[in-house]
């Protein structure tokens, strides 16, 4: 009986049709991957991407030069220099982040009392030279201006958990 069954299965190509059916089931199923450069997956409001310095609605920068972010940074990637202004407040004259040292832990964002330094939604910031990964105050403010709407929305969504 075994030989007859084996001959019958071989003649009807049962193994082939079984494998073909399995392949067709996955061929028409929903794709599990994305076509990355053209499609992007959803990001969490807590996503930690490229750093940015924010401004108030009137255009004044938020950073009060408290240097908490510099003190808490475990990688020592942040360098801040400040000087007093005529009204007695402090403002930064230099705010640099060495992105080659940064470990994207988010401590700088958590330590900031005025939400001046944030990690934005951008994760595509490859560079050809090492110098391009040293962000100065102008570059950080530019990032903040570019993504302010998304950053504000993400901070609002994350507010209940802070």
From Swiss-Prot:
What GO biological process, any one, is recorded here?
Answer: aerobic respiration
Function summary: NDH-1 shuttles electrons from NADH, via FMN and iron-sulfur (Fe-S) centers, to quinones in the respiratory chain. The immediate electron acceptor for the enzyme in this species is believed to be ubiquinone. Couples the redox reaction to proton translocation (for every two electrons transferred, four hydrogen ions are translocated across the cytoplasmic membrane), and thus conserves the redox energy in a proton gradient.
Family statement drawn from the similarity comment of this UniProt entry: Belongs to the complex I 23 kDa subunit family.
Keyword Cell inner membrane attached: yes
Classify the protein's membrane topology as the record does: Peripheral membrane protein
* Localization of this protein: Cell inner membrane
* Annotated catalysed reactions: a quinone + NADH + 5 H(+)(in) = a quinol + NAD(+) + 4 H(+)(out)
Keyword annotations for this protein, in alphabetical order, are: 4Fe-4S, Cell inner membrane, Cell membrane, Iron, Iron-sulfur, Membrane, Metal-binding, NAD, Quinone, Repeat, Translocase, Ubiquinone
InterPro entries in the record:
4Fe4S_Fe-S-bd, 4Fe4S_Fe_S_CS, NADH_quinone_OxRdtase_chainI
Name of the top EC class for this enzyme: translocase
- Source organism, top-level taxon: Bacteria
Q: Which cofactor does it need?
A: [4Fe-4S] cluster
Organism field: Maricaulis maris (strain MCS10) (Caulobacter maris)
Entry's cofactor comment:
Binds 2 [4Fe-4S] clusters per subunit.
Principal localisation: membrane
Q: How does it assemble?
A: NDH-1 is composed of 14 different subunits. Subunits NuoA, H, J, K, L, M, N constitute the membrane sector of the complex.
Q: 4Fe-4S ferredoxin-type domain location, by residue? A: 53-83, 93-122
Q: Which residues bind [4Fe-4S] cluster 2?
A: 73, 102, 105, 108
Task: From the Swiss-Prot or TrEMBL record, give the protein name.
Answer: NADH-quinone oxidoreductase subunit I
Instruction: Extract the GO molecular function terms from the UniProt entry.
Output: 4 iron, 4 sulfur cluster binding; iron ion binding; NADH:ubiquinone reductase (non-electrogenic) activity; quinone binding
Quote the gene name from the UniProt entry: nuoI
Query: Binding positions for [4Fe-4S] cluster 1?
Result: 63, 66, 69, 112
Q: Fetch the PROSITE patterns from UniProt.
A: 4FE4S_FER_1, 4FE4S_FER_2
EC number(s) per entry: 7.1.1.-
CC terms in the record's Gene Ontology section? plasma membrane
């Amino acid at each position: 009986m075994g030989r007859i069954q084996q001959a019958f299965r071989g003649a009807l190509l049962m193994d082939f049709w079984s494998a073909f059916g399995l392949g067709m089931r996955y061929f028409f199923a929903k794709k599990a991957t994305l076509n990355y450069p053209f499609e992007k997956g959803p990001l969490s409001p807590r996503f930690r991407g490229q750093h940015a310095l924010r401004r108030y609605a009137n255009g004044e920068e938020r950073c009060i030069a408290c240097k908490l972010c510099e003190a808490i940074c475990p990688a020592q990637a942040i360098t801040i220099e400040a000087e007093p202004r005529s009204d007695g407040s402090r403002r930064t004259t230099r705010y640099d982040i060495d992105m080659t040292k940064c470990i994207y832990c988010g401590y700088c964002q958590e330590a900031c009392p005025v939400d001046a330094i944030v990690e934005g939604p951008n994760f595509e910031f490859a560079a050809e030279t090492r110098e391009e990964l040293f962000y100065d105050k102008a570059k950080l403010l530019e990032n903040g201006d570019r993504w302010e709407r998304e950053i504000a929305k993400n901070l609002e969504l994350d507010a209940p958990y802070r």
